[in-house]
Amino acid sequence: MPERYTSMMSNLFRARSLMLAALALAAAASTASAQQGAASAAPKRQTDANQSALPATAARVRSTLEKVIHREVLPNGMEVIVVENHGVPLATVEIDVKNGAFTQTPEYEGLAHMYEHMFFKSDSAYPQPDAFTQHAAELGAVFNGSTREEVVNYYLTLPADSLEAGMRLLESAFRAPLFRPDELAREKEVVLGEYDRQESSPFFKFQDEMNHRLWRSAYSRKNTIGNREVIRTVTPEKMREIQKHYYVPNNASLIVAGDVEPQKVFALAREIFRMPKGADPFGTQPIPEVPPLPADDAVIVEQPVSTVLVMEQWLGPSVGEDPEATYAADVFSDVMNQEGSTFQKRLVDSGLWHSVLVNYYTLDHTGPITISGETTPGKLREALAALDAEIAKFDDPDYFTAAEMALQKQQRAVGTALGLERASGFAHELGFWWSVAGLDYYMGYVDNMASQTPDQLRAYVRKYIVGKPRVTGVLISPQDRQRIQLTLDDLHHARLTSSAGGNR
């Protein structure tokens, strides 16, 4: 069995990658990839020729997507999505489920991820331990899964001539898991081991403190790694409860990408995935709204780190409620991260910050807006003051230009086209967007990005950032904090409420 990667595009490690990544977002396959980190690009200012080419590029990308992405909804509500890519004789078969941290009450905190670990265990068709793994090996398949905030995915990549067998293998795991107590006991220790490894990172405490303050009563619905005690006491009955509510065909999609024929895939899906439609899981258990931040908050976390990391976070738009703002958020983030932008010149080129990154993570149930950066203890106070000054100017008429925006739109369009080249990665990407925003959002993404104007970006920052409550966090070593006598009073824009691991 391939090495399992932990879930969720973890907020935990996102903190580190955001702070240490390069500053300009290069061509990104989607907002999903751009939101988890940045690829260095060093783009130049947009020329008139490039600006005029943008609409044609956007149109070509949408046209290409419509040619290679095929869809059908089965009678039981399962959406089947097929992506043709005949470059190599391989196919990826993936099931995506609208589950993840966002469905978790405190009593189930971390069990969406626990369920992911149990998916490839015994089921009614393969009841013996390791039978699933053995059959997958016979098919020449590699398989894995991941749990994020608003989607869980499971996939096999295998020779295209084993497509039907791979679909049957995933169907039985989806429909009829056994949750054997012996397997659950073993896999629980694996998940606890993942928890221990993450907890040992200096960034774990920092991100966890930020998450508690940003999400407040919704914390369990953003905490994919979960609660140790909930994981330790997991039972087969809790696994079955998750299956009953969320693992129903009308809450799942089947994505097949690679060297396949769409009509053959649809016929196989109709034959194999015939389980009855289930109840709407969100009709019986609706997801509560994330509570608004009542005021600014701040925290200082002491850990053995060699630099100073700063994070500012706001509650951003929900894609289902304010989709237009999500397009503006992505363009705005790209423009701010572009080398040569006003933001980068005043903060990084000035020497106050080693790096600063602006980020919006698209989610249906409130996506976070994050500005993260790295500086030195000696420059921290001045760096924070400079960052505050720039944030206050985000909606100034001359803070960014249409020319700066055009280059970033073009890079997004090119990145989407390039993403089609790798079938397995594209399947994962489609699964994320299907669950979080709907496939129609993804299909129209490049067009909507291309239509954004400076006024729309300014409206976004006024609605969600400038003058809005935020959470500010500083990660610093105990020695550096003592040396510079850092207190929450130094985070001057925040209403001082707490300090983790040190004195006020």
Language-model regions, residue ranges each:
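Mature N-terminal segment immediately following signal peptide/propeptide cleavage
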Residues: 57-96
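Short acidic/His-enriched helical or mixed secondary-structure segments at domain edges of catalytic enzymes
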Residues: 137, 190-209, 288-308, 342, ...
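A structural supersecondary motif
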Residues: 311-315, 336-375
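Scaffold signal of the M16-like zinc-metallopeptidase fold and its non-catalytic homologs
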Residues: 44-54, 166, 173, 198-248, ...
